[in-house]
Amino acid sequence: MSESLHFTRHGPILEITLDRPKANAIDAKTSFEMGEVFLNFRDDPELRVAIITGGGEKFFSAGWDLKAAAEGEAPDADFGPGGFAGLTEIFDLDKPVIAAVNGYAFGGGFELALAADFIVCADNASFALPEAKLGIVPDSGGVLRLPKLLPPAIVNEMLMTGRRMDAEEALRWGIVNRVVSQQALMDSARELAQQLVNSAPLAIAALKEIYRATSEMPVEEGYRYIRSGALKHYPSVLHSEDAIEGPQAFAEKRDPVWKGR
């Protein structure tokens, strides 16, 4: 694909590494390439889970490439399919993505991690949205996703002052799933990915679809929507071969063999 992105398939698991000097910052060209990778992941029936990480041990990603900005790349430039970093605006991705945060996740790098379904981070990781100090706004998800995760006082401080949050604080607030040593990071992310592979793919797709559609609804309204037939994956799960295989495998005390149908 490019010198900035490396990806490896391990069976149903896709590992993507952003490796771009300096600080794994992302310009429009790199963002386009990342979007193509994530769309290919979405559309490949053999792939079940993606892991995105950064090259090196210091930066997951510093976000938007300020050198490109200084050379004329506009904040509202076309960053390609999936929005900034290829993931922040994909709203029909029904497969899980794990962000393995290996260091600083600043600005758009933090927004990329927030767009993932799970965050596993190294104990040296830290998170920040410093855009206001640069005269811009974290509009690739930071200003939208962070308020769903944190109390207003913390959100305001992070958005308006750019203050950093370390890995342990992020764990306490529930922003990240796991904090591990730098050396154990990828093993931990791969372990989580394998746990996800062990779950039925249609069920995972339905869960993501339901959550995406109903997360802002009152519970009663959410129930009505689920039963309305408007969803794509949920009805398919109910009448799938996997819905038969799961209980049957449990009764027979064996691992299920998922077919994704």
Curated annotation (Swiss-Prot):
- Enzyme class, UniProt record, top EC level: lyase
Reaction catalysed? (R)-carnitinyl-CoA = crotonobetainyl-CoA + H2O
- Record carries keyword Lyase: yes
Which Gene Ontology BP annotations are present? carnitine metabolic process; fatty acid beta-oxidation
So what EC number does this one have?
A: 4.2.1.149
Role description: Catalyzes the reversible dehydration of L-carnitinyl-CoA to crotonobetainyl-CoA.
The family classification in the record reads:
Belongs to the enoyl-CoA hydratase/isomerase family.
| Pfam families per the UniProt record, alphabetical | ECH_1
Q: What is this protein called?
A: Carnitinyl-CoA dehydratase
This entry's Gene Ontology molecular function terms read: hydro-lyase activity; L-carnitine CoA-transferase activity
SUPFAM superfamilies, alphabetized: ClpP/crotonase (SSF52096)
